[in-house]
């Protein structure tokens, strides 16, 4: 594996290998050392979970880590990201974890610079978030063994969600039994990679084994899509009542950050079925597996 850009570029065997390797790291705490590998984290969008878990993963693997401070870098002088990477590569940095608001940027960088560096996509616009898909699936397979028997529901702004895009793809690759995308009509995607779409919350959650709740982007909700916040809250929020339509042992997940009282109630987020902090924990090990796969190849 030269780069880690999209789930669609991986085989099901590669994905399964990453899942098993992540769980191995989690349960054995036996980590290889890659002290000769240098990695830079370039986050052009704000991040807490992804940025810190990538850095922890890198340090667990004994990599040399460079965190680029964009506010004090030449980016403030108008330097193109392509030139920034070329400059850092000339200093000996081989691996680049990049988050950016532009769809497809990491793939473009890999196409231009791929002979000399390794690009890891930490999220590009509304397009893809592949490491989130890996960690989410690690969390699911840790508790639910037979993916082909599962019904998984994703709830929220599917149309603008890079998390939903990557998760659809990984479900398709691994043969998940059923995937339901629950969203108000204005947030439904024009094209679905895998699964079916509904605007009926209770029907979509009926019998679900896993429920993934997406963050409501309140700034987009109010300004761009003209969807009333109270309407969303009343019809699509994950509450104790709506969760009751899922199976009693259904897993509740959320990629974070959460808007408590908007897309998810605190009673659900902090309840016995919540696996949200387990996702955060697994994010470190999933990203360790991704990095190791790149280095080993």
Curated annotation (Swiss-Prot):
One of its GO terms (cellular component) is cytosol. The keyword S-adenosyl-L-methionine does not apply. InterPro entries: Asp/Orn_carbamoyltranf_P-bd (IPR006132), Asp/Orn_carbamoylTrfase (IPR006130), Asp/Orn_carbamoylTrfase_sf (IPR036901), Asp_carbamoyltransf (IPR002082), Asp_carbamoyltransf_Asp/Orn-bd (IPR006131). Keywords: Pyrimidine biosynthesis, Transferase. One of its GO terms (biological process) is 'de novo' UMP biosynthetic process. L-aspartate binds at residues 77, 162, 215. It catalyses: carbamoyl phosphate + L-aspartate = N-carbamoyl-L-aspartate + phosphate + H(+). The keyword Kinase does not apply. Its EC number is 2.1.3.2. It is an enzyme of class 2 (transferase). Pathway: Pyrimidine metabolism; UMP biosynthesis via de novo pathway; (S)-dihydroorotate from bicarbonate: step 2/3. Carbamoyl phosphate binds at residues 49-50, 99, 129, 132, 256-257. Pfam families: OTCace, OTCace_N. Disulfide bonds: none annotated. GO terms for molecular function: amino acid binding; aspartate carbamoyltransferase activity. PANTHER family: ASPARTATE CARBAMOYLTRANSFERASE, ORNITHINE CARBAMOYLTRANSFERASE, MITOCHONDRIAL. Catalyzes the condensation of carbamoyl phosphate and aspartate to form carbamoyl aspartate and inorganic phosphate, the committed step in the de novo pyrimidine nucleotide biosynthesis pathway. Belongs to the aspartate/ornithine carbamoyltransferase superfamily. ATCase family. Heterododecamer (2C3:3R2) of six catalytic PyrB chains organized as two trimers (C3), and six regulatory PyrI chains organized as three dimers (R2). This is Aspartate carbamoyltransferase catalytic subunit. It comes from Legionella pneumophila (strain Lens).
């Amino acid at each position: 594996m030269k780069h880690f850009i999209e789930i669609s570029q991986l085989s099901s065997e590669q994905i399964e290998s990453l899942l098993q390797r992540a769980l191995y790291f989690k349960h054995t705490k036996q980590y290889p050392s890659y002290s000769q590998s240098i990695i830079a984290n370039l986050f052009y969008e704000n991040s807490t979970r992804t940025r810190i878990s990538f850095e922890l993963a890198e340090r667990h693997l004994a990599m040399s880590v460079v965190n680029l401070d964009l506010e004090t870098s030449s980016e403030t002088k108008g330097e193109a990201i392509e030139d920034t990477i070329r400059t850092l590569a000339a200093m000996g940095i081989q691996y680049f974890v990049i988050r950016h608001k532009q769809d497809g940027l990491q793939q473009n960088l890999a196409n231009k610079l791929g002979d000399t560096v390794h690009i890891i996509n930490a999220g590009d616009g509304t397009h893809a978030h592949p490491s989130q898909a890996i960690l989410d699936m690690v969390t699911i397979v840790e508790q639910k063994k037979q993916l082909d028997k599962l019904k998984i529901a994703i709830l929220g702004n599917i149309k603008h969600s890079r998390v939903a895009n990557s998760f659809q793809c990984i479900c398709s690759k691994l043969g998940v039994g059923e995937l339901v995308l629950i969203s108000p009509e204005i947030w439904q995607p024009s094209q679905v990679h895998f699964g079916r779409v509904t605007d009926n919350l209770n029907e979509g959650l009926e019998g679900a084994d896993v429920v993934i709740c997406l963050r409501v982007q309140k700034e987009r909700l109010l300004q761009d899509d003209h969807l009333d916040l109270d309407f969303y809250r009343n019809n699509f929020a994950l509450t104790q009542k709506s969760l009751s339509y899922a199976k009693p042992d259904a897993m509740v997940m959320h990629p974070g950050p959460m808007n408590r009282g908007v897309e998810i109630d605190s009673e659900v987020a902090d309840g016995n079925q919540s696996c949200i902090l387990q996702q955060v924990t697994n994010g470190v090990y999933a990203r360790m597996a991704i990095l190791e796969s790149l280095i080993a190849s």
